């Protein structure tokens, strides 16, 4: 435990020393550049006399200071590489600025690689032992996420895969547009149940549909729906008309029953007046029965009522359905009354 603490203190001391040294070199460079403008004429004259690129024939002081500054920072980076707690965060940022100044190999005594070993590179990249590097797939298409109680929508999909997702309860299903092989539609979606609510789906749509089959299907079904509506209206109208006709038929049947009852009462009254003989004869007469049947069976819809009188007996008659005019009806009814009177007289 004590050895680790001493090692940490030693590393910190080295880092501080290298940073202080680099700061001093940077200060000297600043002073040199500030006085360079005032001494520019003298330096150029000296270079012409000596025929070299420096005042004393040695290296340029600016290049020398730059080399020292870069070397100091390089040593600091090397020290930080051996110190695990800061090896992940600090060296990466410093390495980027350090590599940016490695454009000129002649002006920098330290190589851009810096003699780094494989372990130091792994530490700077943040890849430790026993860990797998993570990557994120770039999604170039438009992506939108929705939550719904059903995974179905108005498009046709084909499932092409499913896999388990880490730290989730339900698997994720992958779908593509059914018309991709025929029309090249690249729309896809991912469906997964939510862990908090298993009845809810989280649907991720990637891309847009470019197929036209769905639009054509919708266009074909739209007139079919209108036909259903029109057929329903026709059925309703036909049903209403049928009910009206049934009501009229029922009314006519009621009227026929009432007229038949009136005729039966009149016949009974005549029978009582003429005695039992005429009654028996009338009941045995086939002509009276036939005419009574004809009267009941031929009664149809009436447009108006006509009154006819035969002696002291009067009756109300309805127009027959098979009689075209009033003259035919009158002759038919007169013959009926004559037969009825002959039967009663006998």
Swiss-Prot record:
GO terms for cellular component: nucleus. Residues 267-282 have a biased composition (Basic and acidic residues). The keyword Phosphoprotein applies. One of its GO terms (biological process) is regulation of defense response. Keywords: Brassinosteroid signaling pathway, DNA-binding, Ethylene signaling pathway, Jasmonic acid signaling pathway, Nucleus, Phosphoprotein, Plant defense, Transcription, Transcription regulation. It is found in: Nucleus. Residues 146-214 bind DNA. Residues 121-130 have a biased composition (Basic residues). Its main location: nucleus. Belongs to the WRKY group III family. Interacts with WRKY30. Binds to BZR2/BES1 to cooperatively regulate the expression of target genes. Interacts with ASK7/BIN2. This is Probable WRKY transcription factor 54.
């Amino acid at each position: 435990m004590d050895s680790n603490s001493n090692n940490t203190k030693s590393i910190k001391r080295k880092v501080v020393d290298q940073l202080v040294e680099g700061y001093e070199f940077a200060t000297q460079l600043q002073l040199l550049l500030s006085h360079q403008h005032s001494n520019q004429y003298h330096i150029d004259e000296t270079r012409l006399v000596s025929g070299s690129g420096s005042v004393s024939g040695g290296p340029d002081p600016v290049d020398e200071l730059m080399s020292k500054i870069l070397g100091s920072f390089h040593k600091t980076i090397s020290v930080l590489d051996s110190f695990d707690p800061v090896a992940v965060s600090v060296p990466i940022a410093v390495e980027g600025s350090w590599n940016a100044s490695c454009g000129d190999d002649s002006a920098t005594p330290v190589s851009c690689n810096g003699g780094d070993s494989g372990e130091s590179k792994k530490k700077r990249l943040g890849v430790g032992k026993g860990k797998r590097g993570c990557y994120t797939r770039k999604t170039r298409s438009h992506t939108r996420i929705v939550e719904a109680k059903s995974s179905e929508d108005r498009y046709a999909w084909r499932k092409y895969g499913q896999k388990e997702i880490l730290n989730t309860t339900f698997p994720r299903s992958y779908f593509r547009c059914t018309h991709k092989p025929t029309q090249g539609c690249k729309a896809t979606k991912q469906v997964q149940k939510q862990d908090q609510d298993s009845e809810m789906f989280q649907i991720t749509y990637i891309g847009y549909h470019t197929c036209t089959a769905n639009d054509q299907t919708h266009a074909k079904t739209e007139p079919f729906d209108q036909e259903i509506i029109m057929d329903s209206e026709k059925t309703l109208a036909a049903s209403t008309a049928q009910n009206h006709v049934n009501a009229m038929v029922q009314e006519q049947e009621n009227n026929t029953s009432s007229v038949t009852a009136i005729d039966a009462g009149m016949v009974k009254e005549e029978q009582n007046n003429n005695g039992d003989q005429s009654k028996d004869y009338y009941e045995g007469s086939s002509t009276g029965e036939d005419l009574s049947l004809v009267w009941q069976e031929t009664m149809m819809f009436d447009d108006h009522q006509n009154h006819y009188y035969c002696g002291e007996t009067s009756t109300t008659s309805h127009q027959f359905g098979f009689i075209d005019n009033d003259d035919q009806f009158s002759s038919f009814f007169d013959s009926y009354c004559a037969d009825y009177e002959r039967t009663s007289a006998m």
